[in-house]
């Protein structure tokens, strides 16, 4: 069997994800040779600017996709929440492994929960989605930019730079990171980013051999959830750096999608739901986006883009 090269960012979380897929490949195909190609992306290099102000989509994937296109790598493992809805010609993300937790977690050294934070407490995040939802629940808190890899962000909290931070639960679980105090922030009150907690494997469409090798990793239930949520994001023409959230639930052959858009200060929230056949997940996402836009989301998103 051919030697496989996996393109990945160099952060601890990205390496965990790439090594996780490597381990699964070795278990499935004893003797297979797998190597990692570490690549620095634009998002990794610009750490002194809030993500919303860096601009552009694909901050954490563009350079990795270039390695796929020029043949240096056979596949890439992404956090699906970082992957733009439009991919370069010749590439696809067709393998979606089972999803980890889609929730966020509030970490603190002293405070048990979001409601226990004192007025004026400093909460760290560079996600406009998290900022918007935190302020919708607690408009007396102060949000400050928090950049860096996940272990770096947790370290800043433990060093006393913030009263609390909000990060993805999946990353904490994967790297076994924690803080003295924590609270899960999840649906229905706190909605995740599109495809949060899900991994995606990207490859060249023409490489049918690699697709056959990877097929055992695919989880159709997760794939349908991701399709519904990414359909919603596509319909809103949003990137990962806007206050858009989506959460899909599968019940037998039906998908129930909840979409959320709000201003960055938590005001003017729009939250709507749509249910339909799971096989039509993408179209359900697009349809919900149309309804949310008609309800006022276009004006909200225009304001957000003007501020960025």
Swiss-Prot record:
CDD domains: PBP2_EcHMBS_like
Pathway in which the depicted protein is active: Porphyrin-containing compound metabolism; protoporphyrin-IX biosynthesis; coproporphyrinogen-III from 5-aminolevulinate: step 2/4
Residue(s) carrying S-(dipyrrolylmethanemethyl)cysteine: 240
Record GO cellular component, one term: cytoplasm
Keywords for the protein's UniProt record, in alphabetical order: Porphyrin biosynthesis, Transferase
Gene3D superfamilies: Periplasmic binding protein-like II, Porphobilinogen deaminase, C-terminal domain
Transmembrane segments: none
Pfam families hit by this protein: Porphobil_deam, Porphobil_deamC
EC class: transferase
Keyword Transferase: yes
Family: Belongs to the HMBS family.
Additional record remark: The porphobilinogen subunits are added to the dipyrromethane group.
Role description: Tetrapolymerization of the monopyrrole PBG into the hydroxymethylbilane pre-uroporphyrinogen in several discrete steps.
NCBIfam families: hemC (TIGR00212)
Subunit structure as annotated in this protein's UniProt entry: Monomer.
Protein name as catalogued: Porphobilinogen deaminase
Organism: Maridesulfovibrio salexigens (strain ATCC 14822 / DSM 2638 / NCIMB 8403 / VKM B-1763) (Desulfovibrio salexigens)
Lineage of the species this protein comes from: Bacteria, Pseudomonadati, Thermodesulfobacteriota, Desulfovibrionia, Desulfovibrionales
Name of the encoding gene: hemC
């Amino acid at each position: 069997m051919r030697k496989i090269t996996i393109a990945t960012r160099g952060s601890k979380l990205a390496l965990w994800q790439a090594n996780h897929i490597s381990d699964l490949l070795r278990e499935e195909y004893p003797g297979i040779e797998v190597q990692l190609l570490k690549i620095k992306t634009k998002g990794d290099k610009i750490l002194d600017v809030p993500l919303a102000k860096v601009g552009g989509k694909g901050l954490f994937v563009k350079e990795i996709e270039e390695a796929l296109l020029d043949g240096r790598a056979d596949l890439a493992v992404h956090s699906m929440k970082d992957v733009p809805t439009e991919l370069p010609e010749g590439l696809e993300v067709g393998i979606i492994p089972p999803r980890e937790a889609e929730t966020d977690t509030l970490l603190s050294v002293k405070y048990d929960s979001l409601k226990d934070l004192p007025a004026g407490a400093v909460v760290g995040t560079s996600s406009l989605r998290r900022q918007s939802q935190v302020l919708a629940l607690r408009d007396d808190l102060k949000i400050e930019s928090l950049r860096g890899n996940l272990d770096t962000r947790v370290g800043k909290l433990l060093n006393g730079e913030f009263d609390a931070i909000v990060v993805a639960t999946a990353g904490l679980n994967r790297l076994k990171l924690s803080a003295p105090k924590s609270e899960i922030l999840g649906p229905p009150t706190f909605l995740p980013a599109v495809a949060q907690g899900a991994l995606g494997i990207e490859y060249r469409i023409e490489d049918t051999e690699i697709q056959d090798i990877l097929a055992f990793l695919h989880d159709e239930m997760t794939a349908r959830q991701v399709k519904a949520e990414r359909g919603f994001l596509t319909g809103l023409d949003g990137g990962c750096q806007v206050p858009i959230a989506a959460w899909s639930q599968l019940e037998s052959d039906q998908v129930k999608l909840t979409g959320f858009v709000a201003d960055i200060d938590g005001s003017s929230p729009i939250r709507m739901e749509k249910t339909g056949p799971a096989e039509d997940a993408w179209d359900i996402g697009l349809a919900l986006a149309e309804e949310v836009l008609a309800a006022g989301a276009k004006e909200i998103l225009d304001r957000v883009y003007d501020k960025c």
